[in-house]
């Protein structure tokens, strides 16, 4: 099964920007850790990062038929983008929202997610480990989907 990892605006600046909030780890290093988990658990994984809302919407839509689940950190678009929310709802893939920082310890405007209501779950505040937790959760979702498929009567 395949996981599509979508990273939103400014996540390409991890390791440089606001290290007191996001930590020193670069996005490439987070992706390496996620790839290691995927390889160890028989999952395929693809990474995408964009600072542009429309490109993120396009990638979510392209995931339909190409991926089995999405892990997304929409960055600031989390709090503003109805378009990203609608794209997630449209593809109907299990989606996990991820944030490095605990958004509930930050500014009030960061405490409202437009996309959380259409996601399977939200993981926030564990730094880079948030992505590992998302991979564990997605792997569990995939196992549950496979178990349900195995229980379905075979079509003749």
UniProtKB/Swiss-Prot annotation:
Pathway: Metabolic intermediate biosynthesis; chorismate biosynthesis; chorismate from D-erythrose 4-phosphate and phosphoenolpyruvate: step 3/7. The record marks 17 as: Transition state stabilizer. GO terms for molecular function: 3-dehydroquinate dehydratase activity. Keywords: Amino-acid biosynthesis, Aromatic amino acid biosynthesis, Lyase. It comes from the Bacteria. It is an enzyme of class 4 (lyase). InterPro entries: DHquinase_II, DHquinase_II_CS, DHquinase_II_sf. The active site is at residues 22, 99. Belongs to the type-II 3-dehydroquinase family. Catalyzes a trans-dehydration via an enolate intermediate. This is 3-dehydroquinate dehydratase. It comes from Nitratiruptor sp. (strain SB155-2). The gene is aroQ.
């Amino acid at each position: 099964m395949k996981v599509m990892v979508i990273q939103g605006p400014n996540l390409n600046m991890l390791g440089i920007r606001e290290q007191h909030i996001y930590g020193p780890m670069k996005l490439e290093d987070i992706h390496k850790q996620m790839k290691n988990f995927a390889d160890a658990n028989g999952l395929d994984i693809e990474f995408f990062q964009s600072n542009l809302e429309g490109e993120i919407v396009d990638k979510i839509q392209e995931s339909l038929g190409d991926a089995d689940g999405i892990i997304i950190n929409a960055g600031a678009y989390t709090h503003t983008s109805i378009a990203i929310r609608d794209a997630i709802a449209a593809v109907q893939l299990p989606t996990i929202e991820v944030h490095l920082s605990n958004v509930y310890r930050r500014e009030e405007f960061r405490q409202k997610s437009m996309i959380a209501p259409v996601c399977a779950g939200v993981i926030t505040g564990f730094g880079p480990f948030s992505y590992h937790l998302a991979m564990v959760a997605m792997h569990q979702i995939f196992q549950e989907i496979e178990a349900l498929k195995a229980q379905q009567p075979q079509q003749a």
